[in-house]
Regions:
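Conserved donor-binding/catalytic core segment of Leloir-type glycosyltransferases
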Residues: 6-8, 156, 192-222, 232-233
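N-terminal strand-loop element at the rim of the active site
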Residues: 9-16, 36-89, 118, 237-241
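Short amphipathic alpha-helix
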Residues: 19-30, 217-220, 298, 366
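Carbohydrate-associated surface elements
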Residues: 161, 181
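Nucleotide-sugar-dependent
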Residues: 208-212, 267-272, 279-301, 311-319
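Nucleotide-activated donor-binding/catalytic signature segment of Leloir-type glycosyltransferases, i.e.
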Residues: 236, 245-273
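A charged, aromatic-enriched C-terminal amphipathic alpha-helix characteristic of glycosyltransferases
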Residues: 332-335, 341-372
Length: 372
């Protein structure tokens, strides 16, 4: 039986963020698993669009999503001061208004990553409402503690550390831990490609508007024994950050093996991943989400590309599936990072069942969870 899903989010589309890509990829596999999906989201940026052709072209997909971009006549995205406050006010008002207009009778269940949409949907409907919890905040702690008392509320936590925060309210029926996954359609021939002598970081060069400390990876690479025989490729935006990294390299190093490539298209970025040998995870331990709760999309793309993975020894990274394959380094320790890069070349990859980290597997688990 075909399930009709309403996916409501405060994300906007198209966007180059990992979160928006994850949403589109999840929807693709809901559709492949015989679901009809409607995506409702705010037109809150100049680049926002409700054109299915633009969305499909941007994400290089042909999936038949029912697109519903909703007007967003609120300050967030338009006013560039007090952005945190503007976000919360606009998010609340847009969610309340949008949920009121949703035609409840045509959907079997709802999925969201928005606290306020989760809250307002549970006040409106008796149908199941699934919340994807990727991080924690003071507001989220309050809302989830209220919402998990509802019999039709269900929560997907990104890792066990997140789930444990709400242990008093979790039951086997209303909660599950599911890490992110990867679209294996993008990496079908990774094991058969000739690999270049490349170490790669791919992703946003900032996280929550703060630096990912990419300069640390550059410095550590230069200090390693690999800097003469390997290339370090940094792929991602925003453009001003990638430009500043180019300036940093030009001012400090005469090394043609450091390549700051900026934001690439999805196909070009995937090709670079498939041909690399080592993938780097890097983050700041001062950010609670990065340190404890992250399940990075790029990690699963690295595994699907048959890369060795080098990462800081954060609790979140140790919770990742197949983390026994990760070569860990001490955070902010250049020597430890350089040693990890060198060690990655001699370590053998342990067995990885790629199907178990696929988005298809993840979506099947979500559908089983919903039917509990």
């Amino acid at each position: 039986m075909i399930k009709n899903i309403c996916y409501i989010t405060y994300q906007t589309f198209p966007a180059s963020t990992a979160n928006s890509l994850q949403t589109i990829s999840n929807i693709k596999y809901f559709i492949k698993n015989k679901c009809d999906v409607s995506l409702i989201y705010p037109l809150r940026e100049k680049s926002s669009s409700s054109s299915i052709e633009e969305i499909q072209d941007f994400y290089n997909t042909s999936i038949p999503i029912n697109i519903n971009g909703v007007e967003h006549n609120y300050p967030f995205g338009k006013i560039k001061f007090f952005e945190g406050l503007m976000f919360h006010i606009s998010h609340y008002l847009w969610a309340k208004k949008t949920v009121k207009k949703v035609e409840d009778s045509i959907y079997d269940f709802y999925i969201t990553r928005s606290d306020w949409i989760f809250y307002f949907l549970l006040r409106k409907t008796n149908k199941r409402v699934i919340f994807e919890c990727h991080k924690v905040s003071k507001l989220r702690k309050i809302i989830l503690r209220f919402c998990l008392k509802k019999s039709n509320a269900k929560v997907i936590y990104l890792n066990k550390n997140l789930m444990n925060i709400f242990s008093k309210f979790n039951t086997e029926m209303n909660t599950i831990v599911l890490h992110n996954g990867v679209d294996l359609d993008d990496f079908k021939n990774s094991n058969n490609l000739n690999k270049n002598m490349d170490i790669i970081f791919i992703g946003n060069l900032q996280r929550f508007s703060k630096s990912r400390n990419i300069k640390f990876a550059i410095d550590g690479f230069v200090k390693s024994k690999l800097s003469n025989s390997f290339s370090l490729k940094i792929i991602g935006g925003p453009e001003d950050i990638s430009n500043s990294l180019r300036d940093y390299v030009n001012e400090n190093y005469e090394n043609e093996n450091i390549k700051i490539l900026g934001q690439l298209g999805r196909i070009e970025a995937k090709n670079s991943l498939n041909k690399a040998r080592v993938g780097v995870l890097i983050n700041d331990n001062k950010d609670e989400h990065s340190y404890l709760h992250s399940s990075p999309l790029k990690y699963f793309e690295y595994l699907a590309s048959n890369l060795k993975v080098v990462a800081p020894d954060f609790p979140a990274h140790k919770e990742l599936p197949y983390s026994e394959n990760i070569i860990f380094y001490n955070h902010d320790d250049l020597k430890s990072f350089s040693n990890a890069l060198e060690q990655s070349l001699v370590e053998e990859l342990k067995y990885i069942d790629l199907d178990k980290i696929s988005l298809d597997y993840r979506i099947k688990k979500i559908l089983e969870f919903i039917d509990k």
